[in-house]
A protein has these predicted regions:
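Nucleotide/phosphate-binding catalytic cleft detector across ATP-hydrolyzing
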Residues: 1-159, 169-283, 290-317, 322-346
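A structural feature that tracks compact, well-ordered secondary-structure segments
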Residues: 165-167
Length: 346
């Protein structure tokens, strides 16, 4: 009937900084910053959402509060996240109520944290018809075009905004998984702190991100310098100062080492035959930070396993969701969180 036609399917990958959405009806994937700007009044009126809200980050007037609804890969402000998601889905995109959702979730979190992703769309004005969950690293593997049903062992490292998710997959399922609390934010904060201590110079988070993206952190010249804008902490005057690549490398050393140690300890816990396959198949890098210049080489050298970065690492998981939604066979990788008495309650 008509209802069948009107229904849509959405694939959601909700990161700490970016929301990635696949819209089946339009066959498009879009990305927005996972941020809301509120007016600091009694009602907390919405001032801006998504990319618009993010553009004010660090420069917003004092009566505007900027909020990131996700923290370390899970939903920390449920109502804000629900509002933001509905707002973005409806924004001029012919939003269909009664749609179906497939959501990528991290593995190494509590059942309550997992269920929150499900609750987000089931208890909303979106009136979801069906909600299925898929583990993000499984979605990543599908997005990478890997044969997860038959592989003897692969490792995926998803470098995100506030977390790095490490997974060992074999024979169609998850063998081991660990969520490390290191991400883009960790690196940027480290850069801000070191620049502050060594130069008495305060730079913003976006400037730190530019430094992180522009310097090859591991190889290449050790004498490159970038001039960046900030505020001199002694005079209080805004100015530009040169920052060296060596300083940036020093700032990123510890968080990177933490990721490497986590990879090594996961490999140590991996069954020998699966580990042997990982040494042959390699480590696959996904997530918005996987594009960090030189990251691939660094991991390869430190861990001793060939590392490969996805072509579009930041949309790898949502591309996987798209494939899962399109394929009857891959749909088996998803699971529903609807309890038996749940349909009756609605």
């Amino acid at each position: 009937g008509f209802c069948q036609m009107a229904r849509n399917v959405y694939g959601l990958d909700l990161g700490s900084y970016d929301i990635k959405v696949y819209d089946k009806k339009k066959d498009t994937i879009w990305k927005e910053k996972n941020v809301i700007a509120f007016k600091d009044n009694r009602d907390r009126d919405i001032f801006a959402v998504g990319d618009d809200a993010f553009s004010m980050y660090g420069k917003a007037p004092s009566n505007i509060e900027i909020t990131f609804p996700m923290k370390e890969g899970v939903i920390s402000r449920f109502n804000d996240m629900q509002f933001l998601l509905q707002n973005l889905l409806k924004r001029g995109r012919q939003f269909s109520r009664g749609s179906e959702y497939v959501i990528a979730v991290p593995t190494d979190v509590t059942e309550v944290e997992k269920k929150a992703f499900f609750d987000l769309v089931i208890h909303s004005t979106a009136k979801a018809k069906e909600v299925n969950i898929v583990e993000r690293s499984i979605a990543d593997a599908v997005g990478l075009n890997l044969d997860i049903q038959n592989t003897k062992g692969i490792m995926i490292a998803n470098f995100g905004g506030e977390t790095t998710e490490l997974s060992v997959l074999a024979g169609g399922g998850m063998v081991l998984n660990r969520l490390v609390k290191v991400g883009g934010h960790t690196f940027d904060q480290g850069i801000i702190n070191l620049v502050k201590h060594s130069h008495d110079f305060l730079i913003g988070r976006q400037t730190a991100e530019v430094l992180r993206r522009n310097f090859n952190v591991f190889t290449g010249d050790s004498d490159s310098i970038l001039s960046v804008a900030g505020r001199d902490l002694i005079t209080g005057v805004p100015m530009r100062k040169p920052v060296s690549i060596m300083l940036i490398r020093a700032a990123m050393k510890d968080p990177l080492l933490e990721c490497v140690k986590a990879i090594q300890s996961l490999l140590d816990r991996t069954p020998p035959e699966v580990r042997k396959a990982i040494y042959e198949n390699g480590i696959f890098l996904t997530g918005g930070l996987a594009n960090m210049p030189g990251l691939e080489i660094y991991i390869e050298q430190m861990v001793g396993i060939k590392s490969r970065t996805a072509l579009e690492p930041d949309t790898c998981a949502v591309n996987g969701l798209k494939r899962i939604i399109m394929s009857k066979d891959l749909r088996k990788l998803t699971f529903s969180m609807i309890e038996d008495n749940y349909r009756w309650m609605r």
